[in-house]
Amino acid sequence: MFKFDKKQEVFEIGGVKFGGQPGEFPTVLVSTMFYARHKIVTDEDKGIFDRAAAETLWNTQVSLSDATGNPYVNQIVGETPESIKRYIDWFVEIDDRTPFLIDSSAGNVRAAAAQYCTEIGVADRAIHNSINASIEQEEIDVLTESDVEAAIVLAFNATDPTVKGKMDILEVGGSGLTKGMLQISEECGIKYPLIDVAAMPLGAGSGPTIRSIPTMKAKFGLPIGGGYHNMASAWDWLRKFKKTQPDAKAIYMPADIGTNLVAQIAGSDYLLYGPIENVNQIFPAVAMVDIMLGETAKDLGVEIADLENHPVTKLT
């Protein structure tokens, strides 16, 4: 637990603040909805889903945020332009302020979402996910023409998962690339780049993933985060072991939540914690660590931005 010498940028997107010194702001929690094989979705191509179930899940997150003081963001995943537009319509109808990630495994879907958010006037809340080494020119062009000003900038280096490899992909590019991801994001008109350290599996770069958090904050002064739960989900031993146990979820969830807490204590500003169904487990745990970070921030002379609503005050 520490204080960075470099000025730490704070970006406000849809009323949620990302960045700052460790403990200065509560950690931002990012849920995922409409992911592959999400039980509430009945047609992934058309975006047909159980609206009542989705709203119940969302309201649970809102309630836990109210209780703990941790802000939240929603990651909206779509497999087709039609489906992601339908999901966005639903979300902006039930929530008129919260920021959301527009995400898909397909670049054309992400591009369509950025364009759609511009058309319906919610681009100021949209966060493009992501600008990465495989982004194609079509997506770059649409993003540049859109009103979207925030994006996840992914530090994934397919050939070098070390801290240096992650830094290189951000600053100079990688194999076949002539520009770093940060330069590309700037050329796309992104004013609020949120770096994702690209969490790697245990045994294949998980250590450098965590070490890259304070390294990047010290180097760039930008908000840093990631989908750290992927470390647990990609852990072959745990996947096999939990199947031998009577309660697989009880075996799995401590590791899932734990990956986030390790990253949080290392300085991660936001956590893409995965399926929104895990909301009850993640919020109290992250709030607990935020209390520790808040106490440390005070000790180091960091002024907590909204002390009354920070877990260090709200929950003690």
Curated annotation (Swiss-Prot):
Record pathway: One-carbon metabolism; methanogenesis from CO(2); methyl-coenzyme M from 5,10-methylene-5,6,7,8-tetrahydromethanopterin: step 2/2
A single GO BP: methanogenesis, from carbon dioxide
One Gene Ontology term of the molecular function aspect: tetrahydromethanopterin S-methyltransferase activity
A family per Pfam: MtrH
Catalysed reactions, semicolon-separated: 5-methyl-5,6,7,8-tetrahydromethanopterin + coenzyme M + 2 Na(+)(in) = 5,6,7,8-tetrahydromethanopterin + methyl-coenzyme M + 2 Na(+)(out)
Superkingdom assignment: Archaea
InterPro entries in the record: Dihydropteroate_synth-like_sf, MeTrfase_MtrH/MtxH, MtrH
Its biological purpose: Part of a complex that catalyzes the formation of methyl-coenzyme M and tetrahydromethanopterin from coenzyme M and methyl-tetrahydromethanopterin. This is an energy-conserving, sodium-ion translocating step. MtrH catalyzes the transfer of the methyl group from methyl-tetrahydromethanopterin to the corrinoid prosthetic group of MtrA.
The protein's assembly and partners: The complex is composed of 8 subunits; MtrA, MtrB, MtrC, MtrD, MtrE, MtrF, MtrG and MtrH.
Name under which the protein is recorded: Tetrahydromethanopterin S-methyltransferase subunit H
Species this chain originates from: Methanosarcina barkeri (strain Fusaro / DSM 804)
Gene responsible for this protein: mtrH
